[in-house]
Amino acid sequence: MATLNGTSNGHGKMLSLTLQIWRQKNSKTKGRMEEYKIKGVSTEMSFLEMLDMLNEQLIKEGKDPVAFDHDCREGICGMCGAMVNGYAHGPDEATTLCQTHMRSFSDGDTITIEPWRAKAFPVIKDLAVDRTSFERIIQSGGYISVGTGGTPDANAIPIPKEAADRAMDAAQCIGCGACVAACPNASAMLFTSAKISHLANLPQGQVERHLRAANMIRAMDELGFGNCTNHGECEAVCPKEIKMENIALMNREYFGAMM
């Protein structure tokens, strides 16, 4: 039987929490913080499972459940994301919101949950935001359109180990938007640079490298993202630990394109 108020039932410690959650009908309406009490939250639950539990409670009370983005819940897809007590994805480093567990919190805690805050990420509802601006950046050039041969040819092209490692590290970006949410300028330069760096380090990406950088940076600016001023907040909250050195590479690519 479940036990409350910090005791254990054999399935992790049970928590009683106060949740301060941003509620907003859509991007055109004013939002507000609403407070909810929730009991019997196991420390073995993920953060999203805790929100599921809250929504079950709200539905039983005849109230509107909290809208939030999610999909794989395995830290892979990049769909989930929210500001938790002022931190993108929560208190744990290199962790997505869905992989954050309630053992990171204590009984009696008050947890403040807000959506990503950025002009380019308008609120859809509550904690869910529209991140199609990232897709538009990719559409502007984050791909290879030239012929690169058949599938077997990929294994026949020599790539230096260091270049392959840099490309693989950059390719880990899942497009969650935490970098934008954490940045005081709402800059998307870590995201954009990861996509540019991924392809710039591969031989298949060389033909279009300068055009790619110019087009993706232009799209990023047109979509309303801010510029990078080297605060480093993006790297600090990135769940895949994408490094700011990719931004330096992107700037070099852009300068090359403008010459």
Residue ranges and their predicted role:
Residues 14-36:
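Eukaryote-biased recognition of intrinsically disordered, low-complexity regulatory segments
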Residues 67-79:
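Short, structured protein-protein interaction patches enriched in aromatics and acidic/basic residues
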Residues 22, 38-39, 84-86:
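Short strand-turn-strand beta-turns centered on an Asx-Gly dipeptide
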Residues 1-20:
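Charged, low-complexity intrinsically disordered regulatory segments in eukaryotic signaling
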Residues 34-46:
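Short, contiguous acidic and Ser/Thr-rich linear segments
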Residues 84-108, 113:
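Glycine-rich phosphate/adenylate-binding loop and adjacent beta-alpha elements
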Residues 45-64, 109-259:
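Ferredoxin-type iron-sulfur electron-transfer modules in oxidoreductases and energy-metabolism complexes
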